[in-house]
Amino acid sequence: LCNERPSQTWSGNCGNTAHCDKQCQDWEKASHGACHKRENHWKCFCYFNC
């Protein structure tokens, strides 16, 4: 995995990494997704293969 992008389909704070992971895979065709805190906000980030 070498490409991290904020989710294009997630709205609001990310508090459930498992849901973020599933949504990234199902809706954005990513390999993985996870919640991370950036700039004092929890966001869903999707990870894609190179």
From Swiss-Prot:
GO cellular component: extracellular region
Cysteine pairs bridged by disulfides in the record: C2-C50, C14-C35, C20-C44, C24-C46
Principal subcellular localization: secreted
Highest rank taxon of the organism: Eukaryota
Compartments reported by the entry: Secreted
Assigned keywords, A-Z: Antimicrobial, Disulfide bond, Fungicide, Plant defense, Secreted
Pfam name, any one: Gamma-thionin
GO biological process: defense response to fungus; killing of cells of another organism
Role noted for this protein: Possesses antimicrobial activity sensitive to inorganic cations. Binds specifically to the fungal plasma membrane. Has no inhibitory effect on insect gut alpha-amylase.
Similarity annotation: Belongs to the DEFL family.
Protein name: Defensin-like protein 1
